[in-house]
Design a protein with these regions (language model features):
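P-loop NTPase switch module centered on the Walker A-proximal segment
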Residues: 1-114
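Conserved ATP-binding subdomain of kinase catalytic cores across diverse folds
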Residues: 96-182
Length: 182
């Protein structure tokens, strides 16, 4: 999946409508490479090296990240598998499987818990953005926890919360934010 590497896209006949829109009718690998690169953790993400360390990966290792996560994300239902490998959504989807709680702690705090072994699906290898964040399951709901950068004033979460409150007061469509301590 490197810059000089071409990869092929094979779609089951009749399943073309299930592709991401930018891949429908795609005749070259540029859009496929862009899509696959979007399925990995950003290189500027807080604690990126620590998040990837348990898997022996680097942020630029798109193929390695796809191999671990099958390209799954909480943003959509796409699953990326090698040719010949069976369907994987039920086994790897982040909506119906538990998350790796140790990895969640690393992604949110940068601290590696001692004497703990991770289990579950790694949900931290695809969220975009550079701020510390992690997905958690709270009361059977997937909830994104975001933190501020250590090097800033720490007001980013407060800003998102206040913007959400302003949008609600104005009657605008918005994503509801709340403040919490974890």
């Amino acid at each position: 999946f490197g810059e000089s590497c071409a990869v092929g896209l094979r779609v089951e006949p009749g399943a073309e409508e299930l592709l991401p829109l930018n891949l429908v009718g795609c005749s070259n690998d540029i859009e496929l490479r862009r899509f696959l690169n979007s399925r990995r953790i950003p290189k500027n993400r807080a604690y990126v090296e620590r998040i990837l360390a348990p898997f022996g990966l680097r942020a630029s290792d798109t193929k390695g990240i796809i191999d671990v996560t099958k390209g799954m994300s909480l943003n959509d239902p796409y699953c990326v598998v090698p040719a010949g490998e069976g369907p994987c959504f039920a086994e790897y989807n982040l909506f119906g499987n538990s998350f790796d709680t140790v990895l969640s702690v690393i992604a949110y705090t940068g601290r590696i818990p001692s004497n703990q072994v991770g289990s579950g699906i790694p949900s931290e290898l695809s969220p975009s953005g550079s701020f510390p964040k992690t997905w958690r399951v709270v009361d059977d709901r997937r909830v994104l926890y975001k933190a501020a950068h250590d090097d800033g004033l720490g007001l980013e979460p407060v800003s998102e919360y206040l913007a959400s409150q302003v949008a609600a007061a104005m009657g605008l469509p918005h994503v509801a934010y709340d403040l919490d301590v974890w």
